[in-house]
Curated annotation (Swiss-Prot):
This is 1,4-dihydroxy-2-naphthoyl-CoA hydrolase. GO terms for biological process: phylloquinone biosynthetic process. The keyword Hydrolase applies. The active site is at residue 19. Pfam families: 4HBT_2.
Length: 150
């Protein structure tokens, strides 16, 4: 599997993504950043239930809430724009990981998102080691890619 398969995604900006001025509503950038890393782990081959807890079962005893997020808009993103979304995950420490997301239109960086997650035990809410599947995804994303952050 080539990193491009799970680290570069596409998204077309839809009418419902935009405000009355015809540009994306600010909250959508962070939503897209999160959806992109979810899609990335799916393409990589990690089942969602291995990362995201299921309220009906305690199969996954770890949760990964967002503890920090940022969005930077560098150029207007409008209805109909086709964006390339480049994902750069990295491990911060044993219980924190960060996903940097770059949104490009015609190879020009138009926005950036950053989301930091903390790995916690679902019951105690104490910090725990990142799930092995996430560790492998982060490692594979960083070792096998020839991409450079924008």
């Amino acid at each position: 599997m080539k990193p491009k398969n799970w680290l570069i995604l596409k998204r077309k900006v839809r009418f419902g993504d935009c405000d009355s001025a015809g540009v994306i509503h600010f909250h959508n950038l962070l939503r897209w950043a999160h959806e992109s890393w979810e899609e990335s782990i799916d393409i990589y081959g990690i089942p969602h239930q291995d990362i995201f807890p299921d309220s009906n079962s305690h199969k996954n005893q770890i949760i990964c809430p967002i503890v920090n997020c940022e969005a930077n808009f560098l150029s207007p993103i409008k209805i109909g724009d086709l964006l390339s979304i480049k994902i750069f995950p990295k491990k911060i420490n044993n219980h924190l990981f960060q996903v940097n997301t770059f949104f490009l239109k015609d190879e020009i960086n138009v926005a950036e998102g950053k989301i930091i997650h903390c790995s916690l035990d679902v019951d105690s809410k104490l910090k725990v080691k990142l799930p092995d599947q996430l560790e492998r995804w982060i490692e594979a994303s960083n070792i096998n890619t020839n991409l450079k952050e924008c």
